[in-house]
Amino acid sequence: MSNYETSQTSDLKELINKLRDTQTLSKNEWIRLIDGRTPELADYLFENAREVQITHYGHDVYVRGLIEFTNYCRNDCYYCGIRKSNLNAHRYRLTKEEILNCCKTGYELGFRTFVLQGGEDGWFTVPRLADIVSDIHKNWPDCAITLSVGEMEHDAYQTLFDAGADRYLLRHETYNDAHYRKLHPVSLSARHRQNCLWDLKSIGYQIGTGFMVGAPFQTTENLTDDMLFLKELNPHMVGIGPFIPHHDTQFASEPAGTLELTLYLLGLILSLIHI
């Protein structure tokens, strides 16, 4: 390794230390840390992230009961296999009784968090969803209820919260508006999705967000914007994952996101946000 490379690695390690200690980096520092990653730097990051994880979260693993209750969706996101224009998707939706039976089985198995996740299915109106949430809350009051059902207006989120929902998962996908428009139809906007997250947080939900890694057209600057948004929002949960091309979308031939970059970003996020 040359003296220049040694110096650069040392500088980037100092940025990792700064992130760990202050949870703050400038945009330029984020870009340097992402673009300058090496196996050696990743090992140093993971060592630091592991210390943060043990200090703040210990070694506990929490198991969630995920109920995928519908794959109908009104949206047409270009990367998604359940987009409304995919006529090859086998559609289904669970009944209220089937959802409650899933909760009953899960409770008997020891689950104490239920996650209701689905596409933005117009059949499940806010009153219908609120009725289901209310029954889950009444039958299993010691369980947390998490929703992941997409974008709504403030009043709808409030109704579901009042019915007993505790948490809400809504990945922002990408913060940058221009990048967002390349992945979604004009009926959807990055700003509206971000506003949904602010609404959810103001109501009192524990919120989770996140983004795709290696999505088509994604740049380091886009990832940096995502990191700065996470810092500003300070969510309770963050979930990221590599972009996986779906065969029934226009991105079918695009390369998948990498595990290497996903794990590296997870290490950075763990150092950035620890509740």
Stretch-by-stretch model annotation:
Residues 22, 49, 77, 116, ...:
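Conserved, mostly hydrophobic/aromatic
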Residues 226-269:
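A beta-strand-loop signature enriched in Asp, Gly, Thr, and Trp
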Residues 273-275:
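Conserved small/polar residues in nucleotide/adenosyl-binding loops
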Residues 1-75:
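Flexible, acidic/Gly-rich N-terminal and inter-domain linker regions that tether
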Residues 44-86, 91-115, 166:
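N-terminal pre-triad scaffold of radical SAM enzymes
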Residues 84-99, 106-127, 132-197, 206-213, ...:
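Core AdoMet radical
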